């Protein structure tokens, strides 16, 4: 978020819960294997609700793949299978990102078929789960991880230590 967005969140927190402790942090992204996307034409698979209901134009996979040298994002629309075709009809502004719309049997089957049919060099997985555990990705692929980088104090360790001390848990 930009500074104005952060200040809006701070003001809302103060309004709703004036005594709340706020931890400043950055969410940094890293890839399991950056070499998979470097210089490659990449298919980005992202968290579906983030793109559809959330209206985001990019997700963690796109950001990380750009950071690590992807040269192009391949459009999955010509390769869509099953319910994913309906998803793009309902949400035509998704663009060139493939949303993982759920983890039911049919959804996973459609997602797997679409990924494997897409003409790309590599796949970047920006979903909250390890997608390769539930679908067979037949192309080189790598997963995005999020790391929390706390900035200053208060920090989570200090807040939890205080809570434990004050709660007779320690």
Language model feature labels by segment:
Residues 1-22, 134:
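Conserved C-terminal guanine-recognition region of P-loop GTPase G domains, centered on the G4
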Residues 17-170:
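P-loop NTP-binding site
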């Amino acid at each position: 978020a930009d500074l104005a967005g952060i200040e809006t969140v701070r003001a809302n927190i103060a309004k709703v819960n004036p005594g709340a402790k706020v931890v400043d942090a950055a969410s940094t992204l890293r890839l399991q294997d950056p070499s998979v996307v470097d210089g490659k034409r990449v298919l980005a698979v992202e968290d579906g609700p983030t793109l559809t209901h959330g209206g985001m134009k990019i997700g963690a996979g796109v950001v990380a793949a750009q950071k690590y040298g992807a040269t192009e994002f391949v459009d999955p629309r010509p390769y869509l299978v099953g319910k994913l075709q309906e998803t793009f009809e309902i949400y035509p502004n998704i663009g060139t990102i493939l949303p993982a719309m759920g983890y039911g049997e049919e959804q996973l089957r459609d997602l797997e078929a679409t990924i494997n049919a897409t003409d790309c060099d590599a796949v970047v997985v920006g979903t909250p789960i390890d997608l390769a555990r539930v679908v067979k990705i037949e192309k080189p692929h790598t997963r995005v991880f999020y790391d929390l980088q706390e900035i200053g104090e208060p920090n989570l360790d200090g807040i939890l230590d205080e809570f434990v001390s004050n709660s007779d848990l320690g």
